Amino acid sequence: MDAETARKLCDITSTFYRENASSFSSTRRASWAGWGRCLDEMELCAGTSAAVSSGSHLEGSRHEGVARPGKLERDAGERPEDAGSCGERPGGPLPGDVAPLAWQPSREPLRVLDVACGNGRFLRFLQEALPGAAIAYFAVDDCEQLARDGLAGDADNVAFQKLDIANSLINGSIERAIEAPPVDMAVCFGFFHHIPGADSRAALLRALVKSVRPGGHVAVSLWQFAKSPELAAKAVETTAKARVEYGLPALDEGDYLLGWQNRQHAYRYCHTFSDGEVADLARAVDRQASLVARFEADGRTGALNSYLVFRRRA
């Protein structure tokens, strides 16, 4: 994809979130089942995925017993083909691996970087999943309204950075642009599908790995909506309309413009990932991180998102 088309798609998506922040946020309150599995794979706590699946988490609320780490200042692997089928954990550690993170209540605050944080619901999930944990949360998003509305009650332990992530990837500045100290965990959920181009998606994953300390973890989700016949059919229909409206050329394979609640002129760019693309993305950080797990979760089928969990090498 040429840079001009990529920028136009990013601008369409940014406009969508600015104009639909409230309605979008109202549909993004619950935790995803895959998040609990990610914590299990990081060995942060046992049985989280089962708790999420059973609905025992508190949707959209924060835990009253969460300790506060104090106000934060803003300026402050294994090859995927060796991992077996989705849902299997790869074998033992490779040379250069370090001990995995195991959270303990006596530790310093658990430092978490959430890139494309949206309304901050992953923080609320962590507060429920790790009761009593002090969490230092570094939130990055281009839609300030969406983030600030969701994180308003957590000002003491949240540092928010407004950043146009997609365009930072296009101009090659993403690693310099993210403002956060080395963290224990970096996540990016529900956003990789908004990034045009495989090279830019790989660049974001490398930036996430670079942001964590040795032994820290990275977890990302990759939307595979083409696996749903209903979603795939809608994507084809809305993309055809949007291309005419915006005068766009033919898009790359797997690229679509999705509508929103039957609203006029409300589109966002989305890429649906093939299994091969998931494997290719994992390979992009082979030298920097080991693949801890690859699995599928979420949606009506329990398989609309593909997750990758990594541990940074020493």
Regions found by a protein language model. Give the residues of each.
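Short catalytic micro-motifs in class I SAM-dependent methyltransferases
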Residues: 190-194
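Conserved helix-to-beta-strand junction in the class I
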Residues: 207-214
